[in-house]
Amino acid sequence: ALLNSKVASYVMDFLSPTLDYNQGAMGKIPVDVSEKIFDRITELSKQNISIAKKDWDSFETSWNFKRHYLVKEGHQLSEIYSVWQQECEDRYITLKKNEEEINSLFIELYGLEGELTSEVEEKYISITRADKQRDIKSLISYIVGCIMGRYSYQKDGLVIASKFMVDMSDVAGLDNDNIIP
């Protein structure tokens, strides 16, 4: 958490004014945190990791991708998208608030109240926000993946469909010649 805070960036500007952030310069950052503050920073860091993992795992590029976030049985796409949009915004706000609290704790700990603010600019929050164009492209990619046998709308996760599969009912809707009609 410290190395991702504004305090570390501020201190590293003095210890290593170039981009050479090796272990020697990083190891010179003094760390003296009370147990109470350490516990709070740990809690916030774990929340941030969980939020980032959930965000990352909602996309096909993740090894832990299960199912597209816009595919839910029995719901209108517009309703699903509204829920997705709210989930993204909630994650974004929580992550930003947590990062700012971590910054605030370290700024206070190092006595840098007059030098730094805890605010985190939006461009530095790496959590995905809902974007209709990107989300529809992602949904189309997932649907093509279902048609080609990479995914199944019946099962979560990666499904490698081939002529060697014993139970082809597991991949309903699979296109036999991999040419989408």
Would you name each region that the model predicts?
Residues V31-P181:
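Non-catalytic DNA-recognition/assembly elements of restriction-modification systems
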